[in-house]
Regions:
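Carbohydrate transferase catalytic cores enriched for Leloir-type hexosyltransferases
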Residues: 1-351
Length: 351
């Protein structure tokens, strides 16, 4: 029986949500007997589009495509099961699975535009109530969805994220030891906390550098004064980098730093672990669930906690090596193939 996948994510820049959707679809393509991937015409993820042999339908774009073109196409196909993987879907089409990755907009509404909040607060309850089944990416997110939207726990399944096979250790000699962070100015990512803690670590004798990956041209960076950090010779803002370079930076860092207040899953620390890099994570949201005892935890509200974490992981080689080994074990728990099989089983139970 035909299954249709909403592949509008092919028209979007890649974040964790789009990565999940693409990787799951590449696996589902080989697991389902009859599956179509459909998308609007404004595709930017050309390689994935070709690999999935996706089909362009309709004349609209964005949410309007989901509201008008996609349901019309599904009706012409006999109303098959529709799989939505990226936080959205047609509101009034009932025979669907919807994936909601987190409800950060409920927990930190002050960090989102009012137009975004208005739309999501109208859309998400209708998506949840109008779907046959709901998927999310951690037990923590499942609990959050059920709490905020009063959805039955039996209706929600957890399908974990994983890491691309391209992520693996790539050791190289480096000019100086460094900690690594991937920057975002969203409040819940707690980026300024990293800078403040690192400067304090420096004052207490820390010798390492801090490398920060991210686009400083992003409008969100203009909201704060970064001057006292950009002129620090030990803090290097690297801008956006390719996956190949990201793997090199992960593989040769003293540790990866991820003190986020709130995540649905947390892919970057898992990428770091896959590359043999120990991770420092906030003891918050889903991170203890996903990483167990394989990372060093810090209190995301206490700067001194991260300072101590910098000191411990930089000074204790035995401890650092133990985190690397635990990281490898932890990454073995997650694979796109395993996650896609879980989703396939859900799909097959509904068709």
């Amino acid at each position: 029986m035909l299954v249709v996948v909403n592949a509008r994510f092919l028209t979007q820049k890649v974040t964790g949500v789009q990565r999940f959707a693409m990787e799951i679809c590449l696996q589902l393509k080989t697991m389902l007997k009859e599956v179509e991937f459909v998308t609007p015409s404004d595709v930017i993820q050309k390689e994935a589009y070709q690999e999935l042999n996706a089909k362009i339908i309709g004349s609209h774009h964005g949410h309007l495509w989901e509201l008008l073109d996609l349901p019309k196409y599904l009706k012409s196909k006999g109303k098959p099961l529709l799989v939505n993987l990226a936080n959205s879907g047609p509101l009034f089409y009932k025979n669907k699975i919807v994936t909601i990755h987190d409800v950060a907009y409920k927990v930190f509404p002050q960090t989102y535009p009012k137009s975004f909040l208005l739309y999501y607060n109208l859309m998400i309850p209708r998506l949840l109530n109008g779907s046959r089944h709901v998927v999310t990416v951690s037990q923590y997110s499942k609990e959050e969805i059920c709490k905020f939207y009063h959805v039955s726990k039996d209706k929600v399944s957890v399908v974990y994220n994983a890491v691309s096979d391209s992520f693996k250790p790539l050791r190289q000699s480096v000019d100086a030891a460094y900690f690594l962070a991937v920057s975002s100015m969203n409040y819940r990512k707690n980026f300024i906390y990293i800078l403040e803690a690192f400067c304090k670590y420096q004052e207490q004798g820390g010798k390492e550098y801090l490398y920060i990956i991210g686009d400083l041209k992003n409008a969100s960076f203009k909201k704060i004064d970064l001057s006292k950090y950009t002129y620090n010779p030990k803090i290097k803002f690297l801008g956006r980098v390719s996956d190949e370079d990201l793997i090199k930076y992960y593989s040769n860092a003293v540790a990866f730093v991820y003190p986020s207040f709130y995540e649905g899953f947390g892919i970057p620390p898992l990428e770091a672990q896959t590359c043999g890099c120990p991770a420092i994570c906030a003891e918050a949201s889903c991170l203890p669930e996903v990483f167990g005892d394989s990372v060093l935890y810090c209190d995301p509200y206490e700067c001194d906690s991260l300072v101590s974490s910098f000191q411990e992981i930089a000074s204790d080689k035995t401890f650092r090596n133990s985190l690397i080994e635990k990281g490898y074990i932890n990454t073995g728990k997650y694979s796109w193939k395993k996650s896609a099989k879980q989703l396939r089983d859900i799909i097959e139970s509904l068709v």
